[in-house]
Amino acid sequence: MDAALKQEVKDWIADDPDPATALALTELVNRGDEATLRKYFSGFLQFGTAGLRGPIGPGPSCMNRAVVGRTAAGIAAYMKKRGMNSVVIGRDARYGSEDFTFETAEIMSGAGMKVFILPRPLPTPVLAFATSALKCDIGIMVTASHNPPEDNGYKVYIGPVADGINYAASQIINPTDGFIASDIAAVRSLKSQPRGSEWTILGEEEVDEYIKRSSALAPRPSDIKIVYTAMHGVGTETLKKVFTQAGFNNLITVDEQCTPDPDFPTVAFPNPEEPGAIDLALAKAREVDADLVIANDPDADRCAAAINDPVVGWRMLRGDELGIIFGEWIARTHPKGTFGNSIVSSSALRKICAHYGINFQEVLTGFKWLAKIEDLAFGYEEAIGYSVDSKTVNDKDGISAAIFLAQIASDLAKSGLTLTDLLNEVWGRHGFHGTEQISIRVADMSSIARLLNGLRKSPPSEIAGRAVKSIDDLAAPQDGLPPTDGLRIWLDGDIRIIVRPSGTEAKMKCYIEVITATSAESQKLLDEIRGPLKEFLS
């Protein structure tokens, strides 16, 4: 075994606070398993605007107590430099989440911080709300959201103004992530960090207030029949309380998926967007003749929905379709403030805002950018993230979105209308906006960089048989957006394609938008483009 690697591993073992991961590494050293050790020691798990996200395992390249402890120490150092002194910590029900929560609490307490801990595994929006309600400087959520079961992660929120940014209890953006990453890198030894045991386990006050505010989004009780799945996550308890308090008592749960289970046994990936993920919910909807299906992802910050389409039967609404439903409804009923969506989301929201005379702002991908819009009345990203009440949660919130959608569906039903009718009205006014996302998994992120750089140096003249009109390099934007890695490609026929690397997984994401007169024309065009585009990008 390489001597330098062996010494690095031994040094890490000596500093590891978790006997289980220390033993796992010791056994690998004793077996001389250099290949596995190199995988676990391929660099410290990268901290960015999404915080931490990675597989649970030993060593600096995985999620474990040693990595989490060093990260907490780095965040504490960042806080001290800015006179911050309070933190609230939440967690989901994934493997390791409770251990990582209390590892963080010990380090923060040892650093002299005032530490609050949510009383049990709860949705991410509750943590975001608690950060604001408690006026904490920092909020930390231990979760990997909708990642595979072997992963865990760490989201960071900032309460006040910091680094010249009015965070208002939202997730970090540049340059804050870089400052924190530098402070994490400066932590040479975890064992040298003082530990404490002074913290407050919160009661139900913050949870109850969140439930009260969310239920107020649906002031008109209804007996609309809704099937709900939590995707084996932590959403069920909180969502049911919100619906009950709002007077929506005809909620039918998918029992196989509504108890927290870190193995996510009924789905290949615990993401409502993944094919097959809500099959059990759709089956239940057919069985009980439901009016609507609602799904949260495991940490309940995202919301998906399915409707009984009069043409094709039960189907998932695309993220953009749900965004357009929310946008049109809020524009009709409360045409105030600023609306926004991300650059990869449908352009239809901009047109809705123009129609109703509402301010609109486009931002980079990631809800952390939408949360920085002043006076945000509604914001969404196509990856089923929605903000319908930014005064309560300045982040995407799958539970408030769920109850608000239920109210919209109920109000429409009282007029003999459906969500499909609402969408058709928008499409009749602005044209049918067909959108689709293609994801291409890669062995490593460097292959995406090579592809994007190749397109920049040698732009194609045509893609999928259609002439390329122009290419916008998002790394050098012309429209006032901050730079980001990706390309926006315009083809003949006002076809928009955006290509960018995923922020959390080893895959490339491609977003297509076509505008046609009808759904059928849109689907035909997407079908023609999809295959050649995947081949071009692979």
Which residue ranges define each predicted feature?
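An N-terminal, well-structured beta->alpha segment
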Residues: 4-104, 110-111, 200-224, 234
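Short acidic, glycine/serine/threonine-rich loops at helix termini
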Residues: 98-103, 128-132, 150-156, 192-195, ...
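Gly/Ser/Thr-enriched, mixed-charge loops and adjacent short helices
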Residues: 12-16, 20, 36-40, 45, ...
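Phosphate-binding and adjacent anionic-ligand microenvironments
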Residues: 286, 290-292, 315, 333-501, ...
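N-terminal small/polar loop signature for handling phosphorylated ligands or for N-terminal nucleophile
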Residues: 88-151, 242-305
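Conserved phosphate/anionic-ligand binding catalytic regions in large, soluble enzymes, centered on
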Residues: 41-61, 145-147, 230-238, 242, ...
